[in-house]
Regions:
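Flexible "arm" and connector segments at domain edges
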Residues: 1-128
Length: 128
């Protein structure tokens, strides 16, 4: 990928992460279904780092402080990278992921969010 600034497609993200894996495949866990859960757990760990920034620095700092914002965005990228590793473990393509994303978006655009919220109002806390 060149140094020029551009947006990446889901396929780009998957391709870049696969290239990074190929470079380090002798040091990293394999990209196979057996190891997919590990990559998912790593992404959760990175989510924890995002949460820590929010808790320690606050929402305003993420919006207004360039250094805090850069750190937060880097953690977001870490989450995405580990999710791309997980997805690669299952050989899910960018096209599959894009199609699923668009389909979910379209369902959510038609969804009655008020109805969804009210259906859980009578459920006691801590119950499924």
């Amino acid at each position: 990928m060149s140094d020029e600034k551009r947006s990446c497609t889901l396929s780009d993200l998957l391709d870049m992460q696969h290239a990074l894996f190929e470079k380090h495949k002798h040091e990293w866990a394999p990209h196979d279904p057996e190891h997919a859960r590990s990559y998912l757990l790593y992404s959760v760990e990175e989510l924890g780092e995002m949460i820590a920034i929010i808790k320690k620095k606050g929402d305003d700092a993420i919006v207004e402080n360039p250094a805090v914002r850069a750190h937060y965005v880097e953690e977001v990228a870490d989450v995405l990278m580990y999710l791309m590793d997980n997805i690669d473990c299952y050989d899910i393509t960018g096209e599959e992921l894009s199609a699923a994303y668009v389909a979910k978006f379209e369902r959510n655009m038609k969804r009655d969010w008020h109805e969804n919220k009210t259906m859980y109002e009578d459920v006691p806390a801590g119950k499924d």
